[in-house]
Amino acid sequence: MCNNSDRERSSQNSSNFKKNLPDDFHAVIFTGGLFAPPQNTKKYWAETGQPDFIAAADSGLEICDLYCEFYKNEYDFFPDIITGDFDSLNSSALIEKYKIKPDVFPCDKDFTDTELAVAFVYKEAQKHGVKNPHITLVGGDGGRTDHLLNIYDSFAAEKHVSVWLAKEQGLYLLKDGFNCDIFELGIEDIVSVARTSASRTKGALRSEGLVWEANCFRKDGMPSLSNRISQEFYNLSKPVKLCAKGADFLVIVPLSAVVIMSKFEC
């Protein structure tokens, strides 16, 4: 079983540690539902490095356990906190395995297990002097549509995740005033862009390297659905570029893509 001393070694040995994160505190939340298989997330952790904090929400502990085992020689995904109402965890033996007293909430509550984990991460980040942590959410895909919509809506909340690794796609929050470069796209890979629930019409995007560039994007609702890298950019191995101004957006790409965020003037 992995442990926190492994985490320290992983952090020290990761040459890419935090180099591509805009914030100084990286937390991972595992939550129940369909999730990105650990073997399909290797590129993501290679870019972001060893996380600072791990939270498991309800049956997300089962996913956390899978990641802990799969990456035991590379990264430490040992949970720092286990929280939720535990109405979907298949076996309480998993809690005993990690020897952490769970933070248990009643089933009838005002927040989802994922929201509780996000709130806890923000409190933990504040202890480290970080106001806005970088949070990666693993899981939460499929199943109940209301939970899916809640996760989508949470990107517009004051306390939000930064990246959502769903079963087959990664959703990246592209904040106002930020650029993103999307590397390692296949010629048939789908690139989509959505607005957060904060607005249907605000903001504008600039793009480079898409088949249908930003001048073709819809002015309201979802700007671009099922777009692709242009043949020229693919042949030259150039990254697709997107820049957000005036609003936040969600960039949706395959798990195999590598997304790098940076803050520059659009």
Residue ranges and their predicted role:
Residues 132-182:
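Anionic-ligand-binding alpha/beta catalytic cores of soluble enzymes and soluble regulatory domains
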Residues 61-63, 88-91, 111, 144, ...:
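Short gly/pro/ser/thr-enriched loop/turn and capping motifs at secondary-structure boundaries
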Residues 29-31, 58, 138-140, 165-166, ...:
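Short beta-strand segments
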Residues 49-53, 100, 156-164:
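Structural alpha-beta junctions
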Residues 37-39, 63, 111-117, 144-149:
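Short glycine/serine/threonine-rich phosphate/pyrophosphate-binding segments
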Residues 174-266:
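Long, charged alpha-helical interface segments
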Residues 2-96:
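N-terminal beta-strand-loop-alpha-helix module at the start
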Residues 95-128:
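Short phosphate-binding loop-to-helix
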